[in-house]
A protein has these predicted regions:
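Compositionally biased, proline/threonine/alanine/serine-rich low-complexity intrinsically disordered stretches
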Residues: 1-27
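Primary mode marks residue(s) on the alpha4-beta5-alpha5 output face of response regulator receiver
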Residues: 17-114, 118-218
Length: 218
């Protein structure tokens, strides 16, 4: 079964996938390393060279996204709000052209998504998200953002409800990112639809954090 990519959200055609995606985004406030539906890279030993590379990424990112502190500028520049009407701890404003570019090359000034929190009068910029293609190796990821500095993650082991099932028919404790089903065998037994991985590899960065340990933290 074909996987779903960051650049192909379609809430009307695939509402189950949309709900799962929202659950995945919401799970960023949880301990993702403990989730059966999340894989995170292991931190590699620190090195001065990696710290220098990470600093260079931030030096390119900060001025590139400074204007997007006004979220309306981000919208005007082609960023689209993912699930704007669904309450979320963080809202992803995604630039699908940058997402496509990220499948082939890494440009620190072109994050796939901007991360905002909702405010009374709009949105406040918190950070950004870089992506890499699904099939990228950990060495590929390390070449972009050092694995000694940041932990990339991917969303895995997703079992969606049977196609056409209504919410009344679905046990939400079993399906989706918050569900207990985390193997293909169990998913097939439940009549669900199995996705070994959805979306690309991702890594969040919060360049305005004063605490260095929180800049690359989830």
């Amino acid at each position: 079964m074909a996987g779903m990519d960051m650049g192909q959200h379609d809430s009307e055609k695939n509402p189950d996938a949309t709900k799962a995606a929202n659950d995945a985004m919401s799970d960023h406030d949880m301990d993702m390393s403990m989730s059966a539906h999340m894989y995170m890279t292991t931190l590699r030993p620190a090195s001065p060279a990696d710290e220098k590379r990470a600093a260079e990424i931030l030096a390119q990112l900060r001025p590139a996204i400074e204007k997007y502190k006004d979220y309306r500028v981000a919208l005007a520049d082609g960023f689209k709000i993912f699930l704007p009407d669904v309450p979320q701890p963080h809202y992803h404003f995604t630039n699908y052209a940058y997402g496509f570019e990220a499948a082939f090359e890494f440009n620190p000034a072109h994050p796939t998504s901007l991360l905002y929190k909702k405010t009374n009068d709009g949105y406040e910029l918190e950070g950004a998200m870089y992506t890499a293609r699904k099939l990228a190796t950990e060495d590929d990821l390390n070449a972009r953002v050092p694995l000694s500095v940041a932990r990339w993650h991917k969303h895995t082991n997703l079992c969606l409800p049977p196609k056409g099932a209504s919410l009344q028919q679905v046990d939400l404790k079993e399906f989706g990112f918050r569900g207990s089903i985390a193997t293909q065998e169990a998913c097939e037994q439940a009549g669900g639809r199995w996705y070994p991985q959805i979306f690309s590899w991702m890594v969040h960065v919060y360049p305005y954090e004063s605490d260095p340990s929180k800049i690359w933290a989830h």
